[in-house]
């Protein structure tokens, strides 16, 4: 089913860190009725994430960092456990994950497998995130990780079974991370 959409107005409300826009559009429904909508859209750019895993050790590498949006939404300390990720800026997705993995986790990504790409919150956020998995070993450790500039990132290497248990307990609550962990489990990669 294809809908006819006509842009009426695109007004920038804020360009502080990302871009918040107010979009007015007419949507012609399949019965021919034209309905006008006004929505705010948050454009933060597209991103990429990678879950590092080690079959031999049956472990994964995750990070823990402060996320202000979770804190505003009731996460008491604002800390979130998640897969390594970053915004694409002008990079290709695989270039992005390689750069972010070194910066955040300290591990070099050798061979990466793209799993899928998903919209994070399509009701109001433009972001499309490219999700990867990549195997790591001790030899691929380049530095201690921890992020750059103003980032404060803790690197967490943990058993895969513990990561899955943290999902069940509600300790890991980041959508991309849950999807990537479940992807490893569904494919039997860590068996």
UniProtKB/Swiss-Prot annotation:
Residues at which Mg(2+) 1 binds: 85, 104
Quaternary organization: Homodimer.
Reaction(s) catalysed by this chain's protein: GDP-alpha-D-mannose + H2O = alpha-D-mannose 1-phosphate + GMP + 2 H(+)
The entry's keywords: Hydrolase, Magnesium, Metal-binding
Species of origin: Cronobacter sakazakii (strain ATCC BAA-894)
PANTHER family: NUDIX HYDROLASE DOMAIN-CONTAINING PROTEIN, UDP/ADP-SUGAR PYROPHOSPHATASE
Domain notes: In the dimer, the N-terminal domains are swapped between the two monomers, such that residues of both chains contribute to the active site.
Pfam families noted in UniProt: NUDIX
Chain ranges for the short sequence motif Nudix box as given in the UniProt record: 86-106
Binding residues for Mg(2+) 2: 100, 104, 151
Cellular component annotations (GO), alphabetically ordered: cytosol
Family membership: Belongs to the Nudix hydrolase family. NudK subfamily.
EC numbers: 3.6.1.-
GO MF annotations in UniProt: hydrolase activity, acting on acid anhydrides, in phosphorus-containing anhydrides; metal ion binding
Domain of life: Bacteria
Stated name of the protein: GDP-mannose pyrophosphatase
Function: Nucleoside diphosphate sugar hydrolase that hydrolyzes GDP-mannose as its preferred substrate, yielding GMP and mannose-1-phosphate.
Listed cofactors: Mg(2+)
């Amino acid at each position: 089913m294809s809908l006819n959409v006509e842009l009426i107005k695109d007004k920038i409300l804020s360009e502080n860190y990302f871009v918040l826009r107010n979009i007015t559009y007419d949507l012609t429904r399949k019965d021919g009725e034209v309905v006008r909508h006004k929505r705010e859209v948050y454009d933060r750019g597209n991103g990429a994430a990678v879950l590092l895993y080690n079959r031999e050790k049956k472990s994964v590498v995750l990070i823990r960092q402060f996320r202000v949006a979770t804190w505003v939404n009731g996460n008491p300390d604002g800390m979130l456990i998640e897969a390594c990720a970053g915004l694409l800026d002008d990079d290709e997705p695989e270039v992005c994950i390689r750069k972010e993995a070194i910066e955040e986790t300290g591990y070099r990504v050798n061979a990466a497998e793209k799993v899928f790409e998903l919209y994070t919150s399509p009701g109001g956020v433009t972001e499309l995130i490219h999700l990867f998995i990549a195997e790591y070993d001790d030899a691929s450790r380049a530095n201690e990780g921890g992020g750059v500039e103003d980032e404060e990132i803790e690197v967490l290497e943990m058993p895969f079974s513990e990561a899955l248990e943290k999902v069940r307990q509600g300790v890991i609550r980041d959508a991309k991370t849950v999807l990537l962990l479940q992807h490893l489990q569904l494919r039997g990669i860590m068996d």
